[in-house]
Amino acid sequence: MSSKKLIVILGATGNQGGSVAETFLQEPGWQVRAVTRNPSSSKAQALATRGAEVVKADLDDPSSFIPAFKGAHVIFAVSDFWGLFGDPASQGKAAAADQPLNVWAANHETEQLKGVIDAAAKVHTLERFVLSSLSNAAKWSSGKYPHVYHFDSKAKAEAYGGENHPELWAKTSIFQAGYFLSNFVSNPITLPRRFIGGLDPDVELPFIAAEEDTGPIVKAIVLDSGPKKVIGYRARISLRGLIETFSRVTGIKAEPVVLPKGESVVPFPPELQRELDDNWGYWTEFGYYGGDPTVVHPQDLEHAPKLNSVADYFKKQDWSKVFGS
């Protein structure tokens, strides 16, 4: 019988889950069980080669998590609103439900996470459940910004867990990932032509390299003596400060440009534009995590993670792929 502790990682081939897998594969005393929809993918096979146990489970099939979670000491759970939103098959499902696509994706993500939570609550060996969530924009803005669906969908599942599974929630930590630095490399909304968007450039935000930082932060969460709600980031800095760092590191002159509400550098359907407008407004007025007094920061954890800087992230990117050679 193995004396190692078992961490089960959902989304183990993605940004957040992949970082957690990478971290715990290097930790003596831990066995990694990587959960994925496609165990034969190259990323899944690479994890298996390095010693991870790769198992198949699907967020749309809650029963698949019963065997996947068996014997777990720690479970890291993550979902993907934007994956649902971008899946061509979702358009027909949203139409059949007579819902805008982003509303359908949010509702579906909430239901997926409820299934994960229900399954985790049945694991008697579990010592820590770590749920990747985000702040409830509608709640913390007192209803002023009700359309930040990709935040509230996760927060609703989090609330469900607290209300329906108090024993599980007594050993649950919440991980709120900051704004992904990778958005400045691969997201068409925020590629640095100049930064063009609706966000106040002087509002401070938490920035995270999710593919690098999630694992060390989750490790610190797991090692902490009690459950916490942690905002995950490597730096809290304004967009203006971020752009100054980008210019200093790359030598490329850059400046923020703020568009009026309702406008975007990329054309969106009205319902998504409204969501983004509410998103920028919420961050500007209430902050990334809404002023939730229960949130703690990575440096406040008992085993605070050592993370690289924003400058380090920018230095190693191939900006010719963004701007051309």
Language-model region placement:
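Short, amphipathic alpha-helical "lid/cap" segments that border enzyme active or binding sites
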Residues: I66, I117, E211-K219, L307-K315
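Rossmann-fold cofactor-recognition segment
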Residues: L47-D61
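Terminal hydrophobic/aromatic helix or amphipathic segment near a protein terminus
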Residues: R50, L239-D292
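General small-molecule cofactor/ligand-binding pocket signal
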Residues: R33, E53-V55, S173, E255-P260
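Oxidoreductase cofactor-interface core, primarily capturing Rossmann-like NAD(P)-dependent enzymes
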Residues: S2-Q31, V35-Q45, D60-S63, K70, ...
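Short, conserved SAM-binding segment of the class I
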Residues: Q112-G115, A119
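Amphipathic terminal alpha-helices
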Residues: P298-S325
